Amino acid sequence: MPQLNGGGGDDLGANDELISFKDEGEQEEKSSENSSAERDLADVKSSLVNESETNQNSSSDSEAERRPPPRSESFRDKSRESLEEAAKRQDGGLFKGPPYPGYPFIMIPDLTSPYLPNGSLSPTARTLHFQSGSTHYSAYKTIEHQIAVQYLQMKWPLLDVQAGSLQSRQALKDARSPSPAHIVSNKVPVVQHPHHVHPLTPLITYSNEHFTPGNPPPHLPADVDPKTGIPRPPHPPDISPYYPLSPGTVGQIPHPLGWLVPQQGQPVYPITTGGFRHPYPTALTVNASMSRFPPHMVPPHHTLHTTGIPHPAIVTPTVKQESSQSDVGSLHSSKHQDSKKEEEKKKPHIKKPLNAFMLYMKEMRAKVVAECTLKESAAINQILGRRWHALSREEQAKYYELARKERQLHMQLYPGWSARDNYGKKKKRKRDKQPGETNEHSECFLNPCLSLPPITDLSAPKKCRARFGLDQQNNWCGPCRRKKKCVRYIQGEGSCLSPPSSDGSLLDSPPPSPNLLGSPPRDAKSQTEQTQPLSLSLKPDPLAHLSMMPPPPALLLAEATHKASALCPNGALDLPPAALQPAAPSSSIAQPSTSSLHSHSSLAGTQPQPLSLVTKSLE
């Protein structure tokens, strides 16, 4: 490839890439070309309206100069006529006008460096000037670019796109020039396009000046790339660098619609809906303009979503489908949760089987309502309760039999049902935790404080009403007889002491068994003195003052060891010192029970007691 001459004003690029050409017959046609170009430029300037006065966002005069005013109808007609003439001269037939010819292609910033790592100029940075046969494509491309720039400036006045007056001059000059397509205005070096790239490759514009941050101003002679250290041609302030894009280098551009994406360090201009007032919808215009690009240059749908395009009309249908699918998924999950809740609510509430009294109420309620004028349910229930208690045992037995059959039928229908299922779950958890705690205390706490029948099954504590029934009310505890909180139910939770009743006495409890009465050890007695209040006084036996003699120590030793093994087999209890004496003959142990009871009462009377705390003995 020919090299550049050294040390000239044309030495502005790499030696292996750029070559400078001069026009043939430039001296002869210079005057005529200059006059025609100046005449056309004057016509264009006279028909344009300066729009920089309405733009308040311009920060300098250079930006106002770079921002071209909108074109008039006359220039638009001329551009279209020249475009049609150039299209008629084409022999390939691949160029077809878009549905809206005023928006022919898309402006894309140069997001990557135009230089490759090895120092050579990439194909994306090559200037488009080529010739196929005797047809000029540079004129067509330049005019097409002018139409695109003018359209963008008209539709988006805030979008800064360079367009200089020399470009229109270059377009008109190239359109009329019969010389080969190596003519350059203002000595801008150009390179012939490679032969393997199709001459009809669409033109995609770049602007390093306005999009890429960190580049020096275009009027400064920055000949060295700060990143690679390779000399590069500076762009004049009135000519923006436009490069063609070859098919093989499309993958180097990360965002084909990057001119709509604000880059780092760039001022973000809001693109409102007012700027998108097209004769056609925005999405249709973009799709129609992109239909001219080859399939490999059209960006995929997912890039439109990831680039964050502000206007909603540019979002493709696939993105809308994805969002709708996510919404449908969230709605489906919420509906699934609601259906679960509804299923729990729709779960049938299994009622408890009716007991005997409920069956009686069900049968006799209509009669009571017919006899009485009362409509209150509480009053009717009271009347039914009085009549139920007035019934004889034989009459009640009929309803008890019906209740038993009702329970059997209920167990057949709902085998795993429990009445606890109808109550709260928190209470159910507490009941599940209680059996483990009560089993730990079941060995030693067998009710030494109260003389009640022992509880055999502590894992399922029941009240006296459920344990003994109505027929054995003599075995109920005092609180259950007065319809208070059951003592056995409290014992099932691990406590052995019952709260005092409303009247402060425990006289309503059933009488204690004789085998549990005995002289308690000192430790146990002191414990009972501390725990029991002073008001819990028991009636003393009237025969207790008759026998004041101390009992034989052998009897105390035998009974103490027997009670210690019966009350708490795990713990060792201290015995009184009199019990440690040698045992008497067996004949002295076999005494009547009355004498032993009197001896215990006399021992209790001789020992110091707080106030009137004495044990009650059986007659």
From Swiss-Prot:
Q: Where in the cell is it found?
A: Nucleus, PML body; Nucleus
Using the UniProt entry, name the condition the protein is associated with. Constitutive activation and subsequent transactivation of target genes may lead to the maintenance of stem-cell characteristics (cycling and longevity) in cells that should normally undergo terminal differentiation and constitute the primary transforming event in colorectal cancer (CRC).
Point out the DNA-binding stretch(es).
350-418
What are the top taxonomic ranks of the organism?
A: Eukaryota, Metazoa, Chordata, Craniata, Vertebrata
Respond yes or no to whether keyword Ribonucleoprotein is given for this record.
Answer: no
Region span, CTNNB1-binding: 1-53
Per UniProt, the ranges with Low complexity bias are 496-508, 574-603
Substituting T201V results in: Reduced phosphorylation by NLK and enhanced DNA-binding
Organism of origin is Homo sapiens
Q: Mind telling me which PANTHER family this protein's record contains?
A: TRANSCRIPTION FACTOR 7 FAMILY MEMBER, TRANSCRIPTION FACTOR 7-LIKE 2
Regions of compositional bias (Basic and acidic residues) in chain numbering? 19-43, 63-91, 335-346
* Biased amino acid composition, Polar residues: 47-57, 318-328, 604-619
Compositional bias of kind Gly residues: 1-11
Q: Which residues carry this modification: Phosphothreonine?
A: T201, T212
Q: Outcome of E24A? A: Reduces CTNNB1 binding, and abolishes CTNNB1 binding
Highest taxon listed in the record's lineage: Eukaryota
* Protein's UniProt name: Transcription factor 7-like 2
**Signal sequence annotation:** none
Impact after mutating T212V: Reduced phosphorylation by NLK and enhanced DNA-binding
Identify the CDD domains for this entry. HMG-box_TCF7-like
GO CC annotation: beta-catenin-TCF complex; beta-catenin-TCF7L2 complex; catenin-TCF7L2 complex; chromatin; nucleoplasm; nucleus; PML body; protein-DNA complex
Q: Which UniProt keywords apply?
A: Activator, Diabetes mellitus, DNA-binding, Isopeptide bond, Nucleus, Phosphoprotein, Repressor, Transcription, Transcription regulation, Ubl conjugation, Wnt signaling pathway
- Cite the residue spans of the region called Mediates interaction with MAD2L2: 201-395
